[in-house]
Amino acid sequence: MEKDWKLFKKKLGGWQEAYMDRLIEEYKDILNSDASSFDKYCTLRKKIYDDYKSPSVLARDVSRSNMFIILLGLLRDEAITMDDLDGFSDELKEDLQQLLK
C-alpha cells in the first residue's frame, strides 16, 4: 500500500493538470459558440461551478485514507483511465474495478 501511496502522490498533480486542460478546451468551446453573450456566461458559470466540485479539479483531504476515494472520483470523472493506474498494485486496481461496475 505504501508503494501505491507514493505513486499516487507523484501522479495526482499531473492528472489534475491534464483534466483541467481538457476543461479549459470545453470552456473555450462554450465561449466560441454562437450563443448569446448572456447564455455563454450562464453556461460557463454553471459548468465552472459544477466542475469545481469534482475531485479531478480539487482533491480535498489528500491522505492515504482518502487515496482510494480520490482515485475512484478521478475514474468516474474520466480524468484518468485504468491504464493510468499502471504500476499500482493489482489489489487496488481490482477494488476500483469492482466499484466501477
Per-segment meaning from a language model:
Residues 1-101:
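Acidic, Ser/Pro/Thr-rich low-complexity regulatory regions
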